[in-house]
A protein has these predicted regions:
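Short, conserved catalytic-motif segment at the N-terminal edge
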Residues: 8-58, 78-83, 139, 214, ...
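Short, small/polar residue-rich loop motifs at catalytic or cofactor-binding pockets
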Residues: 19-22, 294-297, 424-426
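Short, surface-exposed loop or secondary-structure junction motifs
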Residues: 43-44, 96-294
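Short, glycine/proline-biased beta-turn/loop segments that scaffold the active-site neighborhood
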Residues: 81-95, 184
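Short, gly/Ser/Thr-rich active-site loops of penicillin-recognizing serine hydrolases
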Residues: 285, 314-383
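Short, well-ordered beta-strand elements
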Residues: 289, 299-316, 428-429, 438-444
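Short solvent-exposed beta->alpha transition segments
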Residues: 366-410
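Exposed beta-sheet edge and beta->alpha loop/turn motif
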Residues: 406-446
Length: 446
């Protein structure tokens, strides 16, 4: 009883520390949903409190469902993962030779339609769908030769949704509802375009540049579609996780395939399977995906050696869901969390000082491109710099900076750190090339 009270207090503190309007938090341990609690306000203006029945947009966690749909059709013999995209979506001529598995693995080179200029305005003011999404990138060449590198693109899964619809002769949403929601018992899930008819959908918020919350811009559901269009609850997401990993949605063999990180021809792991990232948190194997829309963020995390799931749904477009998931993991695994403050061996103080400097630069937007490789300097657009500042500045100064180790990546050495803040923890990766220039920076929740 006391442990449950302490856990509830820790979770409520996590939500309040991040100033999250509302969060629904779930913990599944050994097949039982032991935590399904809601905190905060689903609608600030109308003073509606969040409950376990409140529905949230899950964003890119939707990709797990789309990948499962493709694998179901593969199991029925209706498609092959090595089929070329042109067999199903011939109108996208640049991608005609890309295979379905390259889309699933995010190694296709297809440009990301959600990164075009003014996308937020477009997606809130015009009807969406596969055709409008493809129109945004129709004149763009592939970003790289398919199969040669990993680069996350929402377009990959919009295209896979089109494949599901055309092979099954039914809209993607209808297919997901009939073949996944109903099979898993997900009676409180739907799609963004259903929200006006759903009784308990939260209002989404975004943080303005001054940090204040404001109602998020509108999003026409089909713009998110198969890449991020599902609305759900923690209880339903727990049902999805159970059905998926128990082999009730796809075969056990395909579950293993979907949750195994792909390796490029170079042997380098991409850290991504079919709609699932494959990584570690606090030294524990983790199979997970995060999600975000204009006004929501989510985390769906599975720790196979611990037999635990952590599910977090929030109604703010920020890093809050990842922070809260970290704090939830720490609260239910205090002994493992204690190990997070022990640095790895072989730390280089000069590199750590550089990493600290660049954490501050990302928070302030003060980017010195002379320290970057030419390729990375070109890649780091003003929009990306502004986005980093907006997301990281509210965290304040780091309270801890722990070295986690290093690895070789494409001619560079990548150094990993766990960076603590008041109420949050992030992973920071800084890669240094052979000329001493920063070739990449990675930031995310642990």
């Amino acid at each position: 009883m006391l442990a449950a009270i302490a856990l509830s207090a820790a979770l409520q503190n996590a939500v309040q520390a991040n100033k999250t309007p509302a969060a629904e938090i779930g913990v599944v341990r050994s097949g039982k949903l032991i935590v399904d609690d809601a905190y905060g306000m689903a609608d600030l203006n109308r003073h509606v409190a969040a409950t376990p029945q409140t529905q949230f947009e899950i964003g890119s966690v939707t990709k797990q469902f789309t990948a499962a749909a493709i694998l179901q059709l593969k199991e029925k013999g209706e498609l092959n993962l090595t089929d070329p995209l042109g067999k199903y979506v011939p109108e996208y001529t640049q991608g005609k030779d890309i295979t379905l598995e390259q889309l699933l693995w995010q190694v296709s080179g297809v440009p990301n339609y959600t990164e075009v200029n003014h996308f937020q305005h477009i997606a809130g003011s015009t009807p969406g769908g596969v055709d409008p999404a493809l129109a945004l990138i129709a004149k763009k060449p592939l970003d790289f030769k398919p199969g040669t590198r990993f680069e996350y693109s929402n377009t990959n899964y919009i295209l896979l949704g089109a494949v599901v619809a055309r092979v099954s002769h039914t809209p993607w949403e209808t297919y997901i509802r009939r073949n996944i929601f109903e099979r898993a018992g997900m009676s409180h899930s739907g799609f963004i375009q259903d929200e006006p008819r759903l009784p308990d959908t939260a209002t989404g918020y975004a943080r303005a540049k001054n940090g204040k919350l404001q109602v998020a811009p509108p999003l026409h559901g089909p713009w998110a579609g198969a890449a991020g269009g599902i609305v759900s609850t923690v209880a339903d997401m727990a049902k999805w996780d159970a059905a998926f990993f128990d082999g009730r949605v796809i075969s056990a063999q395909d579950v293993a395939l979907a949750t195994t990180a792909h390796r490029l021809s170079s042997g380098k792991s991409t850290g991504y399977g079919f709609g699932w990232f494959v990584d570690k948190k606090a030294g524990q194997p983790e199979i997970a995906h995060s999600g975000g829309t204009f006004g929501f963020a989510s985390e769906n995390e599975y720790f196979p050696t611990l037999h635990e799931f952590v599910i977090v749904l929030t109604n703010v477009a920020a890093l809050d869901a990842g922070f809260i998931a970290d704090q939830t993991f720490d609260a239910i695994n205090p002994q493992i969390a204690a190990l997070e403050n022990k640095p790895a061996k072989g730390e280089d103080p000069a590199i750590t000082a550089l990493a600290r400097q660049w954490m501050h630069r990302m928070q302030t937007g003060d980017i010195d491109k002379s320290q970057l490789s030419s390729a990375f300097a070109k890649h780091l657009t003003p929009q990306m710099i502004g986005g980093m500042k907006q997301g990281l500045a509210p965290l304040g100064d780091p309270t801890s900076f722990v070295y986690r180790g290093k690895s070789k990546e494409s001619g560079s050495t990548a150094y990993q750190y766990s960076v603590g803040f008041k109420g949050a923890r992030l992973d920071l990766t800084i890669a240094i090339d052979g000329h001493g220039k920063i070739s990449s920076l990675g930031i995310g929740s642990e």
